């Protein structure tokens, strides 16, 4: 049974099972809002897999996929709406293509959703979803719409809908402070300002790029008001509705605890350098002081998900004759269907346009009006197609240039890092992460212009994933032998080029998609949906992207040669700062080779890191794209810790948007508990005891911040006489909960002679 409930009573629940759909029909995303207002006459109700409430960031429970044969799927495509065996309540079940009760018709004119099995209409019964005969009640009226794009899982800006000249303003952490309880304000978006970049998580938190657990929160009341508050940052808290947000169809960011209050600002953009953000009630749905747009919007991703809209059909009479005449005339009698060439690579649409524009009605066509109508339509289509193709040609040129030196760049980096590219050593080569990091750099460093490239590129990535969704198995760690790394990267490069080409062709074969895409080509470059490349500095864009891709390749190669050596605060270390060292309150981190803790990287390598803006904190703590295992060592204090070579210290890397916790136990004894921030790694730094030669097993349990299980596994430490310990995950011990994936661990041996521990890094991903 599917329930309906207003926001004040709602709970954010998702599907409990993950079952594969067998449908291969195209699906189009939509949400359905009831026109029934309920007792409070304020809060809207939405069709949901659990409760129905205002549009939230965790839109999976309120987003539905309509297939072209009338099935309504959940957002993951795992279940469909069906009428129960009793013929009244609506429930979620697996697809049965032979069941008519699973087929629905959405009538957007009369706001009805009708079941084809029994002819009844979607209705509400005490906040439960049911079907009933047509009765004229508001409970049977539903308005369907596409959501305001929400950047769930992607980094970007929350930009005010009020544009200011060539600049735009966005939600900003004051002074880029990582301290909790810092004010959130409106500032003009600046390059390389992490305090203006956010990520909306699946549970509705809005993460700051400044730090792993820093989120948007409600601040103090304004003059004691219960309906007006300031905004600030805070540490990520579990099940705290004040930290959970949603975006409705009016582009308003509302709070889950105060659902009628939205984020806005007080002041004039462009007049004041900093404008205070508030949580208050908008004056109307169109109040631009309370409207924000996620930038980039990934508008192309939205467009290709639209219900297809065919070109105007010409099937008979002078309309058909006119279309065929113009097609033959423009293509020199190659085809009487000019639309079939919109996707052609070796054709000149500009030449076609010139011929069609100058064509005159032949005597064989009697209706000059029909001829003129067809001529104007084809001219419009050609103009649209020319501009759409130009957008993708510019993107393909950028993308090809970016990867044109791939082989030589990879070879040079391998030599610098001292990697044997002919070996069968495995490396984590996540191409999608590499591409995403490039788009992040463009967004961050070129706020006006960079999002346009990201809009196309990220949409192409997601379009490719959508096309292969039936084979999607969750997060891939792309384990590749070093000898096959270049081939792997090149294959993925070609696949992404093909994805962009396929997305372009999809748009060019659909009148609605082509019209919408054409409109984006002429938006101002600071509009978050813009595809307007006029005036973009492609040299600057290429430079930023090239550096980002080089950093991504370093992230792949570095763990094969180097690791981090950690020494707790208060102990002597050979270096506390410099090119290969970093210190914080917990201790000192030094980068050196896996075999020798006193063999440091060359300056040419560290210059590529620090001179290109890599954060030392993120690097040494294995945050975001960095994944270096961490070993524990005490250098000249080995007498006090002379068993260090016997030990292995795990590092858990959290690739998700939700904080995690892990505990390590040995035969029931708790050895330590640690919290892992979002997008960061956490090193198990508690000293413990281990036995003599042989295998020793330590159990690790990982949960999310809400205490839900994520993964369990056993670390196997193997000891040999006068050798550093060997470490691995015990075969058969790994248990991963649905919705997560555990990547291949990075395992490094300890050292008896240099007295450092073994290290193991275990990456955990979200699997959709």
Curated annotation (Swiss-Prot):
Subcellular location as annotated: Cytoplasm; Membrane
Q: Where is the Ricin B-type lectin domain?
A: 1-107, 100-248
GO molecular function annotation: carbohydrate binding
Q: Does the keyword Repeat apply?
A: yes
Concerning PROSITE patterns, the annotation shows: RICIN_B_LECTIN
SUPFAM superfamilies with a match to the protein in the record: Ricin B-like lectins
Provide the induction entry: Induced by high levels of extracellular Ca(2+).
Which is one Gene Ontology cellular component term of this protein? membrane
Query: What are the entry keywords?
Result: Cytoplasm, Lectin, Membrane, Repeat
Domain of life of the organism in this record?
Answer: Eukaryota
Per the entry, what this protein does is: May play an important role in stabilizing and/or regulating the cell membrane during Ca(2+) stress or certain stages of development.
**What family is this?**
Belongs to the cup family.
Name the chain's protein. Answer: Calcium up-regulated protein G
What is the taxonomic lineage of the source species? Answer: Eukaryota, Amoebozoa, Evosea, Eumycetozoa, Dictyostelia
């Amino acid at each position: 049974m599917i329930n309906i409930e207003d926001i004040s009573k709602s709970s954010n629940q998702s599907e409990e099972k993950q079952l594969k759909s067998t449908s291969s029909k195209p699906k189009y995303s939509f949400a359905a809002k009831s026109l029934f207002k309920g007792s409070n006459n304020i809060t809207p109700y939405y069709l949901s897999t659990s409760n129905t409430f205002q549009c939230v960031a965790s839109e999976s429970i309120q987003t539905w996929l309509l297939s072209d044969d009338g099935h309504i799927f959940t957002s993951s495509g795992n279940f469909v709406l069906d009428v129960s065996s009793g013929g009244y309540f609506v429930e979620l079940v697996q697809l049965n293509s032979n069941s008519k009760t699973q087929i629905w018709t959405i009538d957007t004119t009369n706001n009805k959703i009708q079941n084809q099995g029994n002819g009844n209409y979607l209705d509400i019964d005490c906040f439960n979803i049911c079907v009933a005969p047509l009765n004229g009640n508001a409970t049977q009226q539903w308005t369907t719409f596409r959501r305001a794009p929400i950047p769930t899982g992607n980094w970007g800006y929350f930009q005010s809908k009020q544009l200011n000249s060539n600049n735009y303003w966005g939600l900003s952490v004051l002074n880029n402070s990582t301290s909790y309880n810092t004010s959130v304000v409106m500032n003009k978006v600046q390059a390389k300002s992490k305090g203006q970049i956010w990520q909306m998580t699946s549970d509705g938190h809005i993460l700051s790029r400044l730090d792993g657990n820093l989120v948007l929160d409600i601040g103090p009341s304004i003059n004691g008001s219960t309906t007006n508050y300031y905004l600030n940052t805070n540490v990520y808290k579990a099940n705290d509705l004040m930290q959970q947000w949603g975006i409705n169809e009016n582009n308003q960011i509302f709070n889950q605890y105060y659902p009628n209050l939205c984020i806005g600002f007080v002041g004039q953009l462009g007049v004041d350098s900093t404008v205070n953000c508030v949580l208050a009630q908008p004056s109307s749905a169109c109040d631009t002081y309370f409207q924000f747009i996620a930038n980039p919007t990934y508008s192309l991703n939205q467009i290709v998900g639209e219900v297809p809209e065919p070109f105007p059909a010409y099937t008979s009479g002078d309309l058909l004759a006119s279309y065929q005449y113009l097609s033959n005339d423009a293509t020199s009698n190659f085809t009487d269907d000019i639309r079939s060439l919109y996707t052609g690579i070796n054709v000149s649409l500009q030449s076609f346009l010139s011929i069609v524009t100058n064509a005159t009605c032949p005597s064989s066509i009697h209706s000059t009006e029909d001829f003129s109508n067809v001529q104007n339509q084809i001219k419009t289509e050609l103009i649209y197609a020319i501009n759409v193709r130009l957008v993708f040609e510019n993107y393909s040129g950028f993308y090809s240039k970016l990867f044109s030196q791939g082989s030589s760049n990879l070879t040079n980096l391998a030599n610098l890092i001292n990697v044997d590219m002919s070996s069968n050593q495995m490396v984590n080569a996540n191409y999608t992460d590499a591409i995403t990091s490039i788009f992040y750099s463009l967004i961050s460093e070129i706020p006006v212009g960079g999002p346009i490239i990201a809009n196309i590129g990220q949409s192409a990535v997601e379009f490719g994933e959508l096309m292969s969704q039936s084979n999607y198995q969750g997060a891939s760690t792309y384990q590749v032998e070093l000898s096959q790394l270049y081939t792997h990267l090149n294959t993925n490069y070609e696949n992404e080029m093909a994805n962009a080409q396929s997305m372009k062709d999809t748009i060019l074969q659909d009148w609605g998609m082509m019209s919408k895409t054409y409109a984006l080509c002429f938006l101002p470059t600071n509009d978050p949906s813009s595809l307007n490349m006029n005036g973009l500095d492609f040299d600057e864009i290429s430079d930023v992207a090239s550096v980002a891709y080089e950093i991504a390749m370093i992230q792949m190669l570095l763990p094969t040669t180097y690791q981090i050596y950690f020494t707790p605060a208060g102990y002597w270390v050979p270096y506390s700062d410099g090119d290969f060292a970093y210190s914080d309150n917990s201790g000192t981190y030094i980068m050196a080779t896996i075999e020798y803790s006193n063999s440091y990287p060359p300056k040419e390598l560290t210059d590529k890191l620090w001179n290109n803006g890599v954060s030392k904190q993120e690097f040494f703590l294995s945050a975001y794209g960095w994944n270096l295992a961490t070993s524990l060592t005490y250098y000249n204090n080995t007498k006090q810790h002379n068993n260090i070579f016997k030990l292995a210290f795990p590092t858990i890397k959290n690739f998700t948007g939700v904080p995690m916790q892990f505990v390590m136990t040995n035969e029931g004894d708790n050895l330590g508990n640690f919290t892992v921030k979002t997008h960061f790694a956490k090193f198990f730094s508690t000293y413990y005891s281990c036995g003599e030669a042989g295998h020793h097993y330590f159990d690790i349990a990982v949960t999310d911040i809400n205490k839900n299980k994520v993964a369990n596994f056993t670390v196997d430490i193997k000891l040999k006489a006068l050798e550093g310990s060997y470490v691995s995950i015990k075969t058969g011990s790994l248990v991963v909960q649905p919705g997560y994936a555990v990547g291949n661990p990075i395992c490094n041996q300890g050292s008896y002679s240099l007295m450092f521990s073994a290290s193991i890094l275990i990456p955990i991903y979200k699997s959709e």
